[in-house]
From Swiss-Prot:
Gene Ontology annotations for the cellular component aspect, listed alphabetically: cytoplasm
UniProt-listed Gene3D superfamilies: 1.10.286.20, DNA helicase RuvA subunit, C-terminal domain, Elongation factor Ts, dimerisation domain
UniProt-recorded name of the protein: Elongation factor Ts
Annotated InterPro entries: EF-Ts_dimer_sf, Transl_elong_EFTs/EF1B, Transl_elong_EFTs/EF1B_dimer, Transl_elong_Ts_CS, UBA-like_sf
Chief localisation class: cytoplasm
Cystine pairs: none
Region feature (Involved in Mg(2+) ion dislocation from EF-Tu): 80-83
Entry function: Associates with the EF-Tu.GDP complex and induces the exchange of GDP to GTP. It remains bound to the aminoacyl-tRNA.EF-Tu.GTP complex up to the GTP hydrolysis stage on the ribosome.
Entry's localization field: Cytoplasm
Similarity comment: Belongs to the EF-Ts family.
Species in which this protein is naturally found: Pasteurella multocida (strain Pm70)
HAMAP family in the record: EF_Ts
Gene for this chain: tsf
Alphabetized GO MF terms: translation elongation factor activity
C-alpha cells in the first residue's frame, strides 16, 4: 500500500478541484497513483472534467473592501487573463466592490441587477463574457484582508487584534487553505469520513478492523489540526502553529473567508494544436 502523503493530496486537490476527503479516498483506491485517481474521479463525476463547450468565464479578479466592523469580498469573472487586466474590466469590478461596501448585506442577485447595463455594454465592447459571480460579507470586532495578485482574496475576523496581525493570518489562509477555524470546529461527518479512510488504510496493511480503529485515533487529532487554521504550522514561522502565534499575541480569530478566482468553475480545455492550425488558415 503506497503512502498517501499530504503533498499528494494537495496536488490532487489542485488538479481536480475536489475536496480533501474525496481526494484522499481516491488516492487510497488508486494505491497512490495520482493519474489513476484523476481518471477514476472523472468517471465518477467527482473531478471537473474539462470540456470544450460554451464560453466559460473562469478568469477574473477578487476584490476586498473593509468597512466599520465588517469586510466584503467580490469575485468578477471574464474569459481570459488578458481581459482580467483590462482597465475597463477592472474599473467595473472596482465599482462593484465599492457599491458592496456602501451597501452592506447586498445580495449577489441585487448586485448583478444593479450593474447589468454596464456589464452588457462592456461585454459588447470587449467581446468577452463576464459576470459578477459572488459576494460575501464578514462581520467582526476587527477585520483584516489580504489579496494575492487579485487571484486570491481573504478576510479574517478577530478579537484583541489589529488589522496588521489579521493580515498576516489572512496571508496564511491564502497559502494554506484551512477549512475550519479550530480543530473542534471540524464537523462530525467530516471526522467520520476521515476515520473510515484511515481505518481502510490501516486494514490494507493487514491489520484487523478492531486494531485499525484503535490505531487511527492519534491520526484523527493530526487530521483535525491539518484542516483547521489554528492547528496548522504558521507560514511566517513554521516552528509554531497559528494557534500558538495568536496566543502569544493575545489575539483570537473568530472566522475567515477565502475566495479564489474560478474555483468550482469548469474551464474550457484548450486544444493548442487546433488553435495553431486554425491560425494558419487566417
Amino acid at each position: 500500500m503506497a503512502e498517501i502523503t499530504a503533498s499528494l493530496v494537495k496536488e490532487l486537490r489542485e488538479r481536480t478541484g475536489a475536496g480533501m476527503m474525496e481526494c484522499k479516498k481516491a488516492l487510497v483506491e488508486a494505491n497512490g497513483d495520482i493519474e489513476l485517481a484523476i481518471d477514476n474521479m472523472r468517471k465518477s463525476g467527482q473531478a471537473k472534467a474539462a470540456k470544450k463547450a460554451g464560453r466559460v468565464a473562469a478568469e477574473g479578479v477578487i476584490l476586498a473592501r473593509i468597512g466599520a466592523g465588517f469586510g466584503v469580498l467580490v469575485e468578477m469573472n471574464c474569459e481570459t487573463d488578458f481581459v482580467a487586466k483590462d482597465a475597463g474590466f477592472l474599473g467595473l469590478a472596482n465599482e462593484v466592490a465599492d457599491y458592496a461596501l456602501a451597501n452592506k448585506g447586498v445580495t449577489i442577485e441585487a448586485l448583478q441587477a444593479q450593474f447589468e447595463e454596464k456589464r452588457a455594454t462592456l461585454v459588447a465592447k470587449i467581446g468577452e463574457n463576464m459576470n459578477i459571480r459572488r459576494v460575501q460579507f464578514l462581520d467582526g470586532d476587527v477585520v483584516g484582508s489580504y489579496l494575492h495578485g487579485a487571484k486570491i482574496g481573504v478576510l479574517v475576523a478577530g478579537k484583541n487584534a489589529d488589522e496588521d496581525l489579521l493580515k498576516k493570518i489572512a496571508m496564511h489562509v491564502a497559502a494554506s487553505r484551512p477549512e475550519f477555524v479550530k480543530p473542534e470546529d471540524v464537523s462530525a461527518d467530516v471526522v467520520a469520513k476521515e476515520r473510515e479512510i484511515q481505518v481502510a488504510i490501516a486494514m490494507e496493511s493487514g491489520k484487523p478492523r478492531e486494531i485499525a480503529e484503535k490505531m487511527v485515533e492519534g491520526r484523527m487529532k493530526k487530521f483535525t489540526g491539518e484542516v483547521s487554521l489554528t492547528g496548522q504550522p504558521f507560514v511566517m514561522d513554521p516552528a509554531k502553529s497559528v494557534g500558538e502565534f495568536l496566543k502569544e499575541s493575545g489575539a483570537d480569530v473568530t472566522n475567515f473567508v477565502r475566495f479564489e478566482v474560478g474555483e468550482g468553475i469548469e474551464k474550457v480545455e484548450s486544444d493548442f494544436a487546433a488553435e495553431v492550425a486554425a491560425m494558419q488558415k487566417i
